[in-house]
Regions:
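Short, cationic-aromatic polyanion-contact patches
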Residues: 65-85
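Short beta-strand "wing" residues that participate in macromolecule-binding interfaces
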Residues: 62
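Short acidic, hydrophobic short linear motifs in intrinsically disordered regions
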Residues: 21-35
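Short, hydrophobic-biased segments on the C-terminal half of alpha helices
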Residues: 48-52
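Amphipathic alpha-helical dimerization/coiled-coil segments
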Residues: 83-114
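Short alpha-helical segments that sit at the start of domains
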Residues: 1-22
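Glycine-centered, phosphate/nucleic-acid-interacting loop/turn motifs that mediate DNA/RNA or nucleotide
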Residues: 58
Length: 114
């Protein structure tokens, strides 16, 4: 499942907040503040829109507590990485893991330079 730059920044921030306090209900404002801490300034409404998109992709789950909505991860970072790796392998190597591994081995010197 493809994710854009802002979606990935939101997810990484979300997972970071979750790892610090597993019992915390995570709000949109928590994510807005977390992003601001790493220099990403976006409007509350922008973050809400992207988080709702992540809900529609079944990556986050939204629930209501009192009058506020909160979010939790439907996928942890490891599950998401595996899902993206499978998608990458399917899209670029026809699902052939051996081809993908050979590609990475052949390009590893270029990858290490960056």
């Amino acid at each position: 499942m493809a994710c854009g730059f802002l979606e990935m920044e939101i997810l990484n921030t979300f997972w970071e907040i979750s790892s610090i306090n597993e019992d915390k209900d995570i709000s949109i404002q928590d994510v807005v503040d977390g992003l601001a801490n790493i220099g990403i300034e976006r409007a509350y409404t922008t973050i809400k829109t992207v988080m709702d998109r992540l809900v529609s992709k079944s990556i986050l789950v939204r629930y209501k507590s009192g009058k506020k909505f909160f979010y939790k991860a439907a996928m942890d970072k490891h599950e998401m990485a595996l899902d993206m790796l499978h998608e990458f392998t399917d899209n670029f190597f026809g699902g052939d893991v051996a081809k993908m591994v050979r590609f990475v081995e052949n390009e590893s010197s270029h990858l290490l330079v960056k």
